[in-house]
């Protein structure tokens, strides 16, 4: 009660915008049982499934689950009916590989939990950033306003090239990830300073880690790299229980990675992937999904000399499953994911594949496509009704539903905007 009193007093002193955004986030946490029956009627339903796009279609939601997709569906008694009038309805979008909920202010270290910096024992694959996830982060409403309903929470390298584990978080106030964990690591020039300034050292260290996880190196060896917990964590990925996401750009490194994945029989995905188009047939044959940094069309390093705006389109034509990723401030700019998909479409990627890269493909890559990523009966009702083309940044999301619950279409940013649009507004 004392803490609540202090919070209210703080709000009275001018923190109402912060309080409002926090209450919004907390309301999502507390409303998990409040999903109502819903019928969205006469929408252009982009299912992101084999059914494609359906004109003048209805979507029926009961108990937070999509129950039917078709025409002329009847609303159950008490259901909320939304007349779409032909506007687009899509699955909730993917926000990319981010630190949403584990990074609030990048320069304030007390709010950043995405990396582990331990110089004496830098290789800790058991490090799991989902344990630090804050569903009340003020970034979540900001991100959700743009139609984004889930993100891959990713560990970032701190003291070692193996960053740690993450997982898929739905932005509905849930505190737990869905689906299996993913392991994140970095290969190439970007990891050079973490591995003795040599790519060869990266593969050497990775191989020793695998040998340890498989019990080929004694746990008490003075040369051991992993803790017992680290060995157990890595062994799960070697058994196929989760995907290893590798940030890599250079074509030669991607080829080496494909050989390694085939030899060790592990499931991988590639992120960044500036020169992936040069290895497209091999990636397609190995069924490796690629998360493309679409706007990386200039060589920021020698690993990216082959960068091109047509990367995503060339990969798609070769049969590679393509999604998107941002490098830089992906967390605070998750809303730009639609722009990345739109740019890929402008440079040759088919529109349907652009949408799939924001919905079905990442859900499949992270092992949650049985729950989210498409509009199909039996899936969670994570939906977005759009004012116009969702891949055109000139248009916007009118309403987001997660698990059938209408999400508040406001954030701390919009509340500050509305406050200071008023004449003589005071801070």
Model regions and ranges:
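N-terminal secretory signal peptides that target proteins for export/translocation
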Residues: 1-14
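Bacterial N-terminal signal peptides
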Residues: 18-30
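Boundary at the C-terminal end of the N-terminal hydrophobic targeting segment
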Residues: 33-35
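C-terminal cap of metal-dependent C-N hydrolases
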Residues: 43, 47, 54-57, 376-420
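Histidine-rich, glycine-flanked metal-binding segment
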Residues: 45, 49-90
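His/Asp/Glu-enriched, well-ordered alpha-helical/loop segment
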Residues: 105-106, 113-119, 126, 243, ...
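Polyanionic/metal-chelating signatures
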Residues: 136-139, 144-268, 396
């Amino acid at each position: 009660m004392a803490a609540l009193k202090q919070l209210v007093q703080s709000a009275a002193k001018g923190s109402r915008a912060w309080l409002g955004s926090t209450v919004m986030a907390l309301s999502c946490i507390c409303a998990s049982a409040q999903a109502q029956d819903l019928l969205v009627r006469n929408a252009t339903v982009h299912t992101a499934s084999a059914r494609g796009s359906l004109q003048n279609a209805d979507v029926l939601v009961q108990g937070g689950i999509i129950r039917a997709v078709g025409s002329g569906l009847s609303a159950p008694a008490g259901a909320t009916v939304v007349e779409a009038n032909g506007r687009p309805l899509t699955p909730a979008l993917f926000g990319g590989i981010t630190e949403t909920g584990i990074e609030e202010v990048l320069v304030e270290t007390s709010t950043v939990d995405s990396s582990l910096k331990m110089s004496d024992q830098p290789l800790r694959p058991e490090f799991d950033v989902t344990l630090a996830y804050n569903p009340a982060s003020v970034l979540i409403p900001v991100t959700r306003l743009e139609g984004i309903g889930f993100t891959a929470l990713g560990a970032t390298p701190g003291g070692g090239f193996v960053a740690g584990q993450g997982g898929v978080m739905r932005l509905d106030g849930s505190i737990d990830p869905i689906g299996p964990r993913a392991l994140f690591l970095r290969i190439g020039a970007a990891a050079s300073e973490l591995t003795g300034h040599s790519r060869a050292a990266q593969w050497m260290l990775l191989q020793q880690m695998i040998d340890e996880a498989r019990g080929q190196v004694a746990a008490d060896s003075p040369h051991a790299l992993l803790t017992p917990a680290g060995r157990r964590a890595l062994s799960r990925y070697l058994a196929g229980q989760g995907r290893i996401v590798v940030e890599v750009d250079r074509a030669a490194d991607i080829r080496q990675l494909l050989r390694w994945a085939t030899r060790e029989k592990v499931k991988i995905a590639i992120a960044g992937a500036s020169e992936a188009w040069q290895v497209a047939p091999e990636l397609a044959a190995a069924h490796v999904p690629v998360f493309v940094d679409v706007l990386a069309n200039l060589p920021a390093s020698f690993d990216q000399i082959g960068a091109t705006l047509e990367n995503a389109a060339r990969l798609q034509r070769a049969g590679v499953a393509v999604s998107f990723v941002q490098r830089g401030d992906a967390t605070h700019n998750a809303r730009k994911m639609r722009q990345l998909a739109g740019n890929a479409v402008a440079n040759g990627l088919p529109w349907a594949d652009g949408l799939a890269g924001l919905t079905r493909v990442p859900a499949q890559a992270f092992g949650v496509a049985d729950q989210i990523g498409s509009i199909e009966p039996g899936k969670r009702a994570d939906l977005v009704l759009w004012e116009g083309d969702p891949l055109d940044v000139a248009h916007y999301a009118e309403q987001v539903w997660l698990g059938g619950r209408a999400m508040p279409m406001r954030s701390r940013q919009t509340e500050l905007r509305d406050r200071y649009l008023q004449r003589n507004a005071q801070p």
